[in-house]
Amino acid sequence: MILIIYAHPYPHHSHANKRMLEQARTLEGVEIRSLYQLYPDFNIDIAAEQEALSRADLIVWQHPMQWYSIPPLLKLWIDKVFSHGWAYGHGGTALHGKHLLWAVTTGGGESHFEIGTHPGFDVLSQPLQATAIYCGLNWLPPFAMHCTFICDDETLEGQARHYKQRLLEWQEAHHG
């Protein structure tokens, strides 16, 4: 099962993430948990989230990039749900062997995130990748949709289909 942990602070303003979710919903075996809808007060149901994670083979963290990082509720979710004794530490093997995909949208162009004056995705993903590895998750190459503020509908739709294809290819490779 693919579990998408969706963290968009302003989902009603979303153009790119909305299309990505629409495409993902067309696949079988996909569950979407919209954190800002489930937890507007930031009071996370840890047991429910851990139960959802236990059913997943692929975990996707999908969100818009904010100040070169993840939205605050996703950070809190990781802090609370990936608990000692469950996700890491003595007896913390619940996530071992599962896969993690970072699916992020950005307002800037792809060249904006190449090494130079701004850090590239290899640098930006390091804290997330380190978290994944520490918890026994298999880190997958990130999926990024760039220029989301200036893309036309056709481009956004094409990128969303590419996202769906990426998820489908993972399903086919791991579940035949």
UniProtKB/Swiss-Prot annotation:
Membrane topology recorded in Swiss-Prot or TrEMBL: Peripheral membrane protein
Binding site residues for FMN: 8, 14-17, 65-68, 105-108
A Pfam family matched in the record: Flavodoxin_2
Cell division recorded as keyword: no
Stretch forming the signal peptide: none
EC number: 1.6.5.2
Cell inner membrane among keywords: yes
Keywords: Cell inner membrane, Cell membrane, Flavoprotein, FMN, Membrane, NAD, Oxidoreductase
Biological processes, Gene Ontology terms: positive regulation of potassium ion transmembrane transport; potassium ion transport
Cofactor (UniProt): FMN
GO CC terms of this entry: plasma membrane
InterPro entries linked: Flavodoxin_fold, Flavoprotein-like_sf, K_H_efflux_KefF, KefG/KefF
GO molecular function, one term: electron transfer activity
Compartment(s) of residence: Cell inner membrane
Reaction(s) catalysed by this chain's protein: a quinone + NADH + H(+) = a quinol + NAD(+); a quinone + NADPH + H(+) = a quinol + NADP(+)
Domain of life where this protein originates: Bacteria
Family stated for the protein in its record: Belongs to the NAD(P)H dehydrogenase (quinone) family. KefF subfamily.
Subunit and interaction comment: Homodimer. Interacts with KefC.
Function: Regulatory subunit of a potassium efflux system that confers protection against electrophiles. Required for full activity of KefC. Shows redox enzymatic activity, but this enzymatic activity is not required for activation of KefC.
Name of this protein: Glutathione-regulated potassium-efflux system ancillary protein KefF
Native organism: Escherichia coli O6:K15:H31 (strain 536 / UPEC)
Lineage: Bacteria, Pseudomonadati, Pseudomonadota, Gammaproteobacteria, Enterobacterales
